[in-house]
Amino acid sequence: MCIRDSQIPIYQNTTWKYDSSEFMGRLFDLEEEGYFYTRLQNPTNDCVAAKICELEGGSAAMLTSSGQAANFYAVFNIAGCGDHVVCSTSIYGGTYNLFAHTMKRMGIEFTFVSPTCSDEELESAFRPNTKAVFGETVANPALTVLDIERFAKAAHDHGVPLIVDNTFPTPINCRPIEWGADIVTHSTTCLLYTSRCV
């Protein structure tokens, strides 16, 4: 009899067994794909990431420990010390503080523009060292809606990606990639997981 679970198993282990120390070394050096520390990756997380990726219409996904970690990695994998990011003013306060204070101390500058700014104001926010544009689909808590197509066009005209935090609408209500976003983040404990509704 074939048993197919309707729920994925929860892998609780933190470490894995390996056939050789050489293979383990390649894993730790990120030269091989596989599991070596569950905080970074495990089969449960991979399954959840794949489901969210499918819902968003994306090509790849990963889970992080929080929505703030997702936003940090989305920006920090693109921008480093001496770089610049254009960002909507209507974003979650924690994200604003991450960008305006923490990442500023790391040498990344942010220019904040209103999501309802004119095309000229948006254009003037770009610099030669701009590496990305960031916004929230529906801002938390202001509920301001980002014109994803307009911000995507501005980003792409400058050869940089648009990163969109899609926490509030979730991919059930909006799929930013279909409107031009390149990277989508979530705080899954907010609405995807519905922990506040149970």
What does each model-found stretch correspond to?
Residues 5-21:
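N-terminal amphipathic/basic leader segments beginning at the initiator methionine
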Residues 61-196:
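Conserved PLP-enzyme active-site core in the AAT-like
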